[in-house]
Amino acid sequence: MKNFKEVIIIFDSGIGGLSYFKYIKSRIGGCQYVYVADNKNFPYGEKSPEYLLEAVLFLIEKLKKIYNIGALVLACNTISVSVYNKLNFVFPVVYTLPDVSSVSDLVLKRVLLIATNTTLESKFVKDQVNIHNDLIVKAAGELVNFVEYGENYKKYALRCLEALKFEVVNTGREIVFLGCTHYLHLKVMIEDFLKIPVYENRELVVKNLIRSMNFSEHKGNYYKNDFDFVDDEFYLTENKNLTFYQNFCKKYNLRFKGMIV
């Protein structure tokens, strides 16, 4: 039976988007959120744009049979640049984009954008390099694996950070733009290692969501008076590493729903 209340779907390949979920929920209360970790296709950074478009369309069709979708937040830079302006749904789609040139505070900064290979190879990022005054891009896929898989990948993450530090020192970078939602879990580690601040775009994403759904930050509180409280929910797309994901569900107060079938 379909849930009659509109939900906001937050979508990523794994746990990267959870920090976005937490931030959005803190700003827009009262709505029900459904988080989908497409772990079957992790990491997105190694998939083609065509594959990622098919993956999104397939999963949204499944979710539409269960929920009345009010909005879709693609809490992943890779899938956002891959399917940007290619989705045609009746509900709004909010993208997480490495839109360096739109941030006024970064216009005159020497910026290092770190992201996955697929993100960096996109037209969106290539346009950013051409538009921005001083933007260098570097792949940092090893950091994604470290966030998702843990200590077994730490040595690769440290090697990656060493290479990024070399780039920062030798090109005089002033700030790092996090072009992958997984990196936000490592914000303190990245800042400590590179000795420069990072920029992350959760605020831009939540403002776009508020605008696209045509409501204020506090409209969600209205729903609390009209509907019984409903748990926010969490889905996977493959039956693996269940304990890992269930622990994150507890941390973020999400009800684990298992696999989307």
Curated annotation (Swiss-Prot):
Q: Which reaction does it catalyse?
A: L-glutamate = D-glutamate
Q: Keyword Isomerase on this protein?
A: yes
Identify the metabolic or biological route this protein is part of.
Cell wall biogenesis; peptidoglycan biosynthesis
A single GO molecular-function term is: glutamate racemase activity
Which keywords accompany this UniProt record? Cell shape, Cell wall biogenesis/degradation, Isomerase, Peptidoglycan synthesis
Q: What GO biological process terms does the UniProt entry carry, in alphabetical order?
A: cell wall organization; peptidoglycan biosynthetic process; regulation of cell shape
Q: What is its EC number?
A: 5.1.1.3
Disulphide bonds annotated for this chain are none
In this chain, substrate is annotated as bound at D12, S13, Y44, G45, N77, T78, T181, H182
Q: Which InterPro entries match?
A: Asp/Glu_race, Glu_race
Catalytic residues?
Answer: C76 (proton donor/acceptor), C180 (proton donor/acceptor)
Cell wall biogenesis/degradation found in the keyword field: yes
Which PANTHER family does its entry note? ASPARTATE-GLUTAMATE RACEMASE FAMILY, GLUTAMATE RACEMASE
- Biological role: Provides the (R)-glutamate required for cell wall biosynthesis.
Q: Which family does it belong to?
A: Belongs to the aspartate/glutamate racemases family.
Which NCBIfam families does the record match to this protein? glut_race (TIGR00067)
**Protein name listed in UniProt:** Glutamate racemase
Organism in which the protein naturally occurs? Borreliella burgdorferi (strain ATCC 35210 / DSM 4680 / CIP 102532 / B31)
Name the lineage.
Bacteria, Pseudomonadati, Spirochaetota, Spirochaetia, Spirochaetales
